[in-house]
Amino acid sequence: LHRFLQRHGISRLPDTEGDKPKHAKFKTYPIGYFHIDIAEVQAAEGKLRLFVAIDRTSKFAFVELHQQAGKMVAAGFLRRLIEAVPYKIHTVLTDNGIQFTNRACDIYAFHHIFGRVCDENGIEHRLTKVKHPWTNGQVERMNRTIKEATVKRSYYETHDQLRRHLSDFVAAYNFARRLKTLRGLTPYAFICQQGKKTITVQTKPAPPNPKTKQLGRGSCW
């Protein structure tokens, strides 16, 4: 019977409706929707907090290393992200950590400083569902990418060594790494394609590096 079916091009029964699960597609957004998260990295000198932001659409990444990860540091990170990005940031997505939002029990607390920075700049602040970290998967993947290229591959005596390597990696990622999700473009080239104006990219507080490419006035915008 099997050979008979093969001879007539019927080697298997047709799929019936509902056999294959339908995968929901992510909603597309214009550039300016950033996923933000905090991770931890280690050097011989001690631990640092890695603040990471990545644009959902352009994949442009912005990172900083800090000794602490409090709400004031998070608010400062957001302000510098806004300064570094040449286009309007309309939405940020974070988890429910105290760096980004008040706890549910803090009913008498003032409006969170991170939320105030969002309001001051016309940014919608969205939160992931509690105990659903995968809803912020884009930045989780970027965290892994950064760690695999830095602390999981190299040994750093000092924080400054890690900062310099991280700065070089993020610059190479934004300006030289071609991504399948961008149809072979780099994040920089994709943003240029959008017809925007100016961008200045730097990983703070890393010291200036002559090998790190920066965008400024007179770039493709």
Short names for language-model regions:
Residues 94-96, 104-118, 123-147, 158-167, ...:
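RNase H-like two-metal-ion nuclease catalytic core shared by retroviral integrases
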Residues 1, 37, 53, 59, ...:
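Mobile genetic element proteins and their domesticated derivatives, centered on retroelements
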Residues 1-36, 98, 105, 109-115, ...:
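Basic, flexible linker segments flanking DNA-binding modules
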Residues 121-123, 144-221:
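C-terminal domain-tail junction helix/linker
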Residues 60-64, 126-128, 152:
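Short small-residue beta-strand/loop micro-motif enriched in glycine and branched aliphatics
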Residues 6-55, 60, 72-76, 84-89, ...:
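Mobile-element integrase/transposase regions
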Residues 67-71:
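A short acidic/small-residue loop/turn micro-motif
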